[in-house]
Amino acid sequence: MSLKERKSINECDLKGKKVLIRVDFNVPLDDGNITNDYRIRSALPAVQKVLTEGGSCVLMSHLGRPKGVSMAEGKELRSTGGIPGFEQKATLKPVAKALSELLSRPVTFAPDCLNAADVVSKMSPGDVVLLENVRFYKEEGSKSTEEREAMAKILASYGDVYISDAFGTAHRDSATMTGIPKILGHGAAGYLMEKEISYFAKVLGNPPRPLVAIVGGAKVSDKIQLLDNMLQRIDYLLIGGAMAYTFLKAQGYSIGISMCEESKLEFARSLLKKAEDRKVQVILPIDHVCHTEFKAVDSPLITEDQNIPEGHMALDIGPKTIEKYVQTIGKCKSAIWNGPMGVFEMVPYSKGTFAIAKAMGRGTHEHGLMSIIGGGESAGAAELCGEAARISHVSTGGGASLELLEGKTLPGVTVLDEKE
């Protein structure tokens, strides 16, 4: 069963139907103000499709990691006029306001996701209801199938059709991702989910060649399965971020006081050997931007070669490495990027990460490169340097995209109907 063969929202009869859409409105908030509405804007096409077709929308999402209460505790709280599981920092109320402005129509906010039957029963075609944070109830992410089902049953009673547009949580077996479609006996992908599935199917299936994977971030241990799985599919592997120093130490270079996972040196050696056997070209940093402390300075030290001096830590890839990595991306027809090249949040160490984003944006724009950013920090960096709009696909799911690249299946995708 390939990734892309899932029923689409376009194949659903939506007229006069109450449509449950699991969206991902897990947006950053600062004192109740949304600082980046990208995830809300990404969900608009599916919502607008339902409204245009004469249906109404019941939207479900999580936000953050609230403590949550059990359904039994919620019932008790409700009887005394309380709001179950409520946490000010995790309420979706500001999202309802932002969504209303983006849609130019009222959005009704239901302050208790499991006590919204009354609100939902009064809906007419064209209406939009946003339920409060589904994680205010522990059953949403419970390890017990029965508990997840109990919550899903109530939510499923609010609608006729289930659409999943929350790729960011597709790796989670939860009441709203897998419970509802199982109870309703059907489920289809929204436009965002469809786009995610389609791009990952391409890169993991039969992508235009050569294919380069750019992998960064702090720990080798976080990327072991990804590196192992991708090695069977790629032509080039560019390694950056703190994980690169474990690979350099494994090859005998001095890394000063840079971060290193001693327990992963053997894995690094075996991966390099495997890559050689498979004729995958692994490229490691050939120079570094360093300092004696983990802090921003005006003139950090730039090394001459791979070796990092005693008492120094590398915090970004150097100019010669940037040039080499950019040239390699320029030779390729497909590129997938997961993890920053350095501590890009600090200006002196942001050049490497931003250069990768720019090389991918330019390659896509000028040479038709198929470029994919696997969510998380890399997506944030591309957004920060203004390149996100030029990339073929910036994933909205850090954890979900990582699991796909590791070769795992996603419960929130496999539960959806197969394409007829």
Curated annotation (Swiss-Prot):
It holds the Pfam family PGK. It is found in: Cytoplasm. Its cofactor is Mg(2+). Its EC number is 2.7.2.3. Keywords: ATP-binding, Cytoplasm, Glycolysis, Kinase, Magnesium, Metal-binding, Nucleotide-binding, Transferase. GO terms for biological process: gluconeogenesis; glycolytic process. Mg(2+) binds at A218, D222, E377. (2R)-3-phosphoglycerate binds at V23, D24, F25, N26, R39, S61, H62, G64, R65, R135, H171, R172, K219. Coiled coil: none annotated. GO terms for cellular component: cytosol. Pathway: Carbohydrate degradation; glycolysis; pyruvate from D-glyceraldehyde 3-phosphate: step 2/5. GO terms for molecular function: ADP binding; ATP binding; metal ion binding; phosphoglycerate kinase activity. Signal peptide: none annotated. It catalyses: (2R)-3-phosphoglycerate + ATP = (2R)-3-phospho-glyceroyl phosphate + ADP. CDP binds at G217, D222, G241, G339, F344. Monomer. Belongs to the phosphoglycerate kinase family. PANTHER family: PHOSPHOGLYCERATE KINASE, PHOSPHOGLYCERATE KINASE 1, CHLOROPLASTIC-RELATED. This is Phosphoglycerate kinase, cytosolic.
